[in-house]
Regions:
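PAS-associated C-terminal cap
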Residues: 1-3, 104-120
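PAS/PAS-like sensory domain cap-loop motif
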Residues: 32-43
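PAS-family and closely related small sensory beta-sandwich domains used
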Residues: 20, 27-28, 42
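Terminal output helix/cap of sensory domains in signal transduction proteins
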Residues: 43-76
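Sensory modules in modular signal-transduction proteins
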Residues: 1-22, 124, 128
Length: 150
């Protein structure tokens, strides 16, 4: 194991390198191996090992990548049931063009945001009901029926 691999293996983020023509996984770090429950040096196509597919993914970012920077996106991986923030880039590795992907698990953040959205929606509904019921000149039975119908 070289120094670069040692550094990548100590990251919490999931990292892999795949050949852009063949989709062959050339490297992945320990965090990815643990998250996907795969042996440290399993060989295969990225779409097979990381997505459980038989063909390249319809959402593959190879066509969106350029030499100028990275492509950042969010994705829910059904195979492991986790949400990720992904950063993909092109580089040269052993004389070939490869995609490097770094993935941060944002599942807890996504679940928290969903809960906050539900709470905000409920709070807005309660405020709407309270405003309707607070009107002093309102017909209370009508307002109660109106609020219950909302």
């Amino acid at each position: 194991m070289n120094m670069h691999e040692k550094i990548l293996d100590n990251l919490q983020e999931l990292v892999y390198i795949a050949d852009m023509e063949t989709y062959e996984l050339l490297y992945y770090n320990r965090a990815l191996a643990e998250e996907f429950h795969i042996p440290q040096r399993l060989h295969g196509k990225c779409y097979e090992i990381l997505q459980g597919r038989r063909a390249p993914c319809p959402f593959c970012t190879n066509g969106k990548l350029s030499q100028d920077g990275c492509y950042v996106w969010k994705f829910y991986n059904q195979l492991v049931g986790r949400h990720f923030l992904l950063s993909d880039s092109i580089c040269e590795f052993n004389g070939r063009q490869v995609r490097t992907e770094i993935a941060s698990d944002i599942t807890e953040h996504v679940l928290l945001q969903e809960q906050l959205d539900k709470n905000l929606s409920l709070q807005n509904f309660i405020n709407h009901c309270a405003r309707k019921l607070y009107r002093q000149d309102a017909d209370l039975p009508f307002l109660i029926d109106d609020v219950l119908a909302a």
